[in-house]
Amino acid sequence: AALLREKFDDGSLQEYYDALTARNYDDLETGAMFLTEKQGGSDVGANETVAEPTDEDGVYELTGEKWFCSNIDAGAPLVLARRPEAPEGTDGLSLFVVPDEVDGEPNDLYYRRLKDKLGTKSVPTGEVELRGATGYLVGEPERGFKYMTEMLNYERLTNATGAVGIMGRALLEAKIHAANREAFGETIQEFPLMKRDLVELTVDYEAAAAFAFEAAKHYVAREADGDDSAAYRLMRLLVPVAKYRTARMAVETSSYAMEVLGGNGYVRGFTTERLYRDAQVLPIWEGTSNVLSLDVLRVLDKEAAHEALLPYVRDLLDVEHPFVESVAGTVEGRFLELQEALMTLATEDEEYAQYHA
């Protein structure tokens, strides 16, 4: 949320920016993104929360319900709402900061209930009812979805790095257990099958980390190069793919790490069962797998991201080193398959493209 205000705010919300970026715990406020409504999760344009203007410029009263709000007790959440006479769909949504307190008094936010979730228990998630809550317009009216998309890029990137974190911890737990658990007179890490599995988990972890940080590199480069640059198009393509792939890998890795620990890994109180539960949400929030796939299609179609991707991959494959020669050959074969798939998508109708996304 602080990143968003730094980019789009005109200075009128400096108070909240300072609170969100404070180093002193007593002054710190946490941010959140209240986006999902009961009738519109991924279909953001169906949101029904309304924002009525007040006599004060840039100040609105928000009325509506938000259905799945993570970090529900945030001090300065961002909320999407529709002003009177704004168009339907995402084009009519504006972005507001809705603090939990206004002039020292509680804002008109009603926390209906907390969700009883499978995992991420340490992050309170619940339903919020806005009953004429005071909200401050962020940026320009009816540009809220664009601003929120900017925030989603960042959130998807942190989702990818969070997935890498879960994979790393799960791998560590599996390695430690395998190094200490004895069976049939030796530690189980000495058995060929376990050696193979631990190596494969390690490769997956390192690949996921490399991919996530490569996407992060282009996210940072885009800040310097602007939205018309190759870095921007690569960022828009790599971030959803990194989110999609690392989330799935975290679920698989945490599941197998639990298996390595045997029955103990399945018992509450052991780290692996919590990692497994927490990993389940990674493919869901900030865009499900299908939503991300459709986003990639849009980026390829509307922003020609493949024009930046193809030379980027060719440069990566242009290496001369004996240790990566065979790997580069394997990747080059998959790269050719990717190019063929892109050509097919470009020549088929929209329904075919979505089905095979």
Residue ranges and their predicted role:
Residues 1-5:
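Low-complexity, highly charged intrinsically disordered N-terminal segments
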Residues 8-49, 53-58, 213-232, 239, ...:
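Internal maturation/activation junctions in enzymes
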Residues 39-42, 68-70, 87, 117-124:
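Short Gly/Pro-enriched turn/cap motifs at secondary-structure boundaries
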Residues 59-108:
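A short core secondary-structure module
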Residues 101-108, 112, 117, 124-155, ...:
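A glycine-rich, basic-preceded beta-loop-alpha segment at the flavin cofactor/substrate interface
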Residues 138-151, 176-192, 215-234, 259-278, ...:
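Conserved catalytic-core motifs characterized by acidic clusters
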Residues 156-224, 306-314, 319-357:
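Extended amphipathic alpha-helical segments enriched in small hydrophobics
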Residues 233-314:
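Alpha-helix capping/hinge segments and adjacent helical runs
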